[in-house]
Amino acid sequence: MYKVVCFDLDDTLSKEIKYLESAYKEIARYAARHCEGCSDSVNILEAKSFKEMLRAYHEGKNTFDELNSFLGLSIHVKDYLDIYRNFKPTWQLLPEVSDLLNRLKEDGCILGLISDGRSVQQRNKFNALGLNRWINNNDVVISEEFGSEKPSLANYEYFMKRYPNAEFTYVGDNPKKDFFAPNQLGWNTVCLLD
């Protein structure tokens, strides 16, 4: 019997906050370049804008409205969202995550990914992290592409149909949505809480 180990992406294989911070830096750079009447240099404006965005985020405010107000801009939220959603991050897996994936592959495990989110964002993260070294593209289920979100059974049943008679394990971080379906289907589950 072979083993299939599927992972969640955000806050399991990578920290979602790292994506958010790197995307915010890109947005801050974009906004700073559009601030024609600002007295600070673009680099200083980028740094201040990034700090302002993080403040707004942590206070639960609309980050993009706060950024526009801070810089005196009227950039459409859609423009900011386009940058956020299409941003190509440049970060790497933590060494211990790479070591784990290497060990699982060496042990003959088939690795998969089950992740909620927008296709472009999740694929950009997948590619930036180099996950294709361990996970075959056919073993990636992203909710927007697949047509259902966790905790739908369908996302997990996909792997059960693809690999009949395998032993399945799911590794995730969200007790509210990551474990209902795999537990119901008899999978082993591992919860990583931060």
Q: Over which residues does each language-model region extend?
A:
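Active-site neighborhood of HAD-like aspartate-dependent phosphohydrolases
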Residues: 1-45
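Substrate-recognition "cap/lid" segment bordering the active-site pocket of phosphatases
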Residues: 118-169, 176-177
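Conserved phosphate-coupling serine/threonine residues in phosphotransfer and NTP-handling enzymes
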Residues: 115
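Acidic, Mg2+-coordinating phosphoryl-transfer loop and its flanking beta/alpha structural elements
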Residues: 169-194
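A metal-dependent, Asp-based hydrolase signature
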Residues: 51-83
